[in-house]
């Protein structure tokens, strides 16, 4: 199957997708009523899109193309208001977090959608297990070769993005001992982790053609790499973040990725090489397991660095780009987060350690998303 030409888009424009949990009080288990909610809110939207994801307990909020994080925040805030109002009318709750802490995957109903039903046929129970919730950020690129360079550059910072956004310590009623357990769900998928090595857009088109021979790949949407190019949108999409508990944190993560993209494409600090990925999965694992306390290893020198320290270095590097893009508030907020030494996974564990229950934790997450 041939790949679409790369659609030229304005560099550094943004798109944000948030996969939200639809909750059923008073049990605070996942609901299976996302279709009802989506039908109720669609006529009220003035910008962005609200749509299904894999199962009936998931709802996706997606912005349109945005110039900067302020425009993205305005669109997401408007969608948030509409969704919360409809959820209240239908006696449902909405919250973030990368996993629901005690849902059972066997109870999850795959959406009655041709693509998702085909995916269920291909992957079986793995699709129901993939009832997890992530944030995806698209960044515009001028051409396909820039997109491939940007993808490789951003891959250096996958552990940093994971550690900052980690919000999935609990699954199936248990503490997983991971800061981000969500990404482990995808380890059984054949397209898990980094994209196979290519050096330019022409090589990527050849890779996609060969992948399509498997009959499991019909479009870019069928590839679940940590970062992927999207020729139809003219973007590179970063997919490793847990859905945050607050809209503010989602915006901050998007601002970091936008600023990092600007720094990478203007400064070109790396010459991408296949060997860059030798320790990719080890460093990714450190971020998932330990969050900002993880230790990453340089594939060339063997140097080992705390993720917290290396994240501060990244934030310093991208600060000039953030100022140009109007994203400096995001960088400042994330810098403060790192210096305080925490992420949302840590907050969740503290809630339980203080005597809270997993049901109470989900209730609290719904209150946080509603601004209570």
Curated annotation (Swiss-Prot):
Keywords: ATP-binding, Ligase, Nucleotide-binding. Its EC number is 6.3.2.2. Gene3D superfamilies: 3.30.590.20. It catalyses: L-cysteine + L-glutamate + ATP = gamma-L-glutamyl-L-cysteine + ADP + phosphate + H(+). InterPro entries: GCL_type2/YbdK_subfam, GCS2, Gln_synth/guanido_kin_cat_dom, YbdK. One of its GO terms (biological process) is modified amino acid biosynthetic process. GO terms for molecular function: ATP binding; glutamate-cysteine ligase activity. Pfam families: GCS2. PANTHER family: GLUTAMATE--CYSTEINE LIGASE 2-RELATED (PTHR36510:SF1). ATP-dependent carboxylate-amine ligase which exhibits weak glutamate--cysteine ligase activity. Homodimer. Belongs to the glutamate--cysteine ligase type 2 family. YbdK subfamily. This is Putative glutamate--cysteine ligase 2. It comes from Salmonella gallinarum (strain 287/91 / NCTC 13346). The gene is ybdK.
């Amino acid at each position: 199957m041939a790949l679409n030409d790369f659609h030229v888009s304005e560099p550094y424009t943004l798109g944000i997708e948030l996969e939200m949990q639809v909750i059923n009080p008073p049990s605070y288990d996942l609901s299976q009523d996302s279709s009802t909610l989506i039908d109720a809110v669609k006529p009220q939207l003035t910008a962005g899109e609200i749509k299904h994801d894999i199962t009936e307990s998931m709802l996706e909020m997606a912005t349109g193309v945005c110039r900067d994080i302020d425009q993205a925040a305005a669109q997401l805030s408007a969608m948030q208001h509409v969704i919360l109002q409809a959820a209240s009318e239908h006696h449902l709750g909405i919250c973030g977090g990368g996993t629901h802490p005690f849902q059972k995957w066997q109870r999850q109903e795959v959406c009655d959608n041709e693509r998702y039903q085909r995916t269920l046929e291909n992957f079986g129970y793995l699709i129901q297990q993939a009832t997890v919730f992530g944030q995806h950020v698209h960044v515009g690129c001028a051409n396909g070769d820039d997109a491939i360079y940007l993808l490789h550059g951003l891959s250096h910072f996958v552990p940093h993005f994971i550690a900052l956004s980690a919000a999935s310590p609990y699954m199936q009623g248990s503490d997983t001992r991971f800061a981000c357990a969500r990404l482990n769900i995808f380890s059984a998928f054949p397209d898990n982790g980094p994209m196979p090595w290519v050096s330019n857009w022409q090589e990527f088109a050849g890779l996609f053609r060969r992948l399509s021979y498997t009959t499991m790949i019909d479009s870019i949407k069928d590839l679940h790499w940590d970062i992927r190019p999207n020729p139809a949108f003219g973007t590179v999409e970063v997919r490793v973040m847990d859905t945050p508990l607050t809209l503010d944190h989602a915006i901050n993560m998007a601002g970091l990725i936008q600023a990092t993209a600007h720094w990478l494409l203007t400064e070109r600090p790396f010459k991408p090489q296949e060997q860059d990925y030798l320790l990719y999965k080890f460093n990714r694992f450190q971020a998932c397991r330990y969050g900002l306390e993880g230790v990453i290893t340089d594939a060339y020198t063997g140097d080992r660095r705390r993720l917290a320290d290396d994240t501060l270095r990244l934030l310093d590097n991208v600060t000039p780009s953030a100022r140009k893009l109007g994203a400096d508030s995001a960088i400042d907020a994330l810098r403060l987060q790192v210096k305080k030494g925490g992420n949302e996974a840590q907050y969740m564990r503290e809630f339980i350690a203080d005597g809270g229950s997993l049901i109470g934790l989900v209730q609290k997450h719904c209150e946080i998303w509603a601004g209570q």
